[in-house]
């Protein structure tokens, strides 16, 4: 079984998870940074499973990952991503649901993994400005509160969980 790990990473969080997944795959494999690809027309024909890693932008995957996902057909797909907020609760689940909904129906989604990543310093300043305009916006307030907590993410536990996710997806891909 041959695997392709694709990832888009703005701050290095998703790249860290991508290489954790890549290192866990024991069979033939390739890894590519979506943002370095000139043409999104990747030949998926030689791959049995595609792992696609994204970073969360405004409640969904980044635009380059979205473009790639919309152009994958007839493949087994495992999604992984990072987000500045905690992935726990309904917000993380809603992101996964939105992303899975943009994948063409001729693919088989094996599973999804999402974890918290370090929030970029530039976003902290942006959120402070946004909060001035919308002081009652709970999501923005959560992002600011999360900033300090996020600095250690993805942490050792999340790296371990990503590793287990990769193993489970490879097992699932070989069974289905």
Curated annotation (Swiss-Prot):
GO BP, sorted A to Z: heme biosynthetic process
MF-aspect GO terms: electron transfer activity; FMN binding; menaquinone-dependent protoporphyrinogen oxidase activity; oxidoreductase activity, acting on NAD(P)H
Function: Together with BilR, catalyzes reduction of mesobilirubin and/or bilirubin to urobilinogen, a key step during heme degradation. BilS is probably involved in electron transfer for the bilirubin reductase BilR.
Name the record gives this protein: Flavodoxin-like domain-containing protein BilS
Matching PANTHER family: PROTOPORPHYRINOGEN IX DEHYDROGENASE [MENAQUINONE], PROTOPORPHYRINOGEN IX DEHYDROGENASE [QUINONE]
Organism: Clostridioides difficile (strain CD3)
InterPro entries: BilS (IPR054633), Flavodoxin/NO_synth (IPR008254), Flavodoxin_CS (IPR001226), Flavoprotein-like_sf (IPR029039), Protoporphyrinogen_IX_DH (IPR052200)
Pathway named in the protein's UniProt entry: Porphyrin-containing compound metabolism; protoheme degradation
């Amino acid at each position: 079984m041959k695997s392709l790990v694709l990832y888009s990473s703005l701050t290095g969080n998703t790249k860290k998870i991508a290489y954790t997944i890549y290192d866990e795959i024991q069979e033939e494999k390739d890894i590519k940074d979506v943002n370095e690809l000139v043409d999104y027309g990747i030949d998926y024909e030689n791959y049995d499973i595609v792992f696609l890693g994204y970073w969360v932008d405004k409640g969904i995957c980044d635009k380059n990952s979205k473009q790639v996902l919309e152009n994958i057909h007839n493949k087994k797909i495992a999604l992984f991503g990072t987000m500045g907020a905690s992935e726990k609760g309904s917000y993380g689940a809603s992101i996964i649901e939105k992303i899975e909904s943009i994948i063409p129906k001729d693919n088989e989604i094996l599973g999804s993994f999402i974890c918290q990543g370090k929030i970029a310093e530039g976003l902290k300043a942006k959120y402070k400005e946004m909060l001035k305009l919308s002081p009652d916006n709970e999501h923005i307030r959560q992002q600011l509160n999360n900033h300090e907590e996020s600095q250690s993410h993805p942490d050792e536990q999340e790296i371990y969980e990503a590793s287990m996710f990769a193993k489970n997806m490879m097992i699932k891909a070989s069974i289905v």
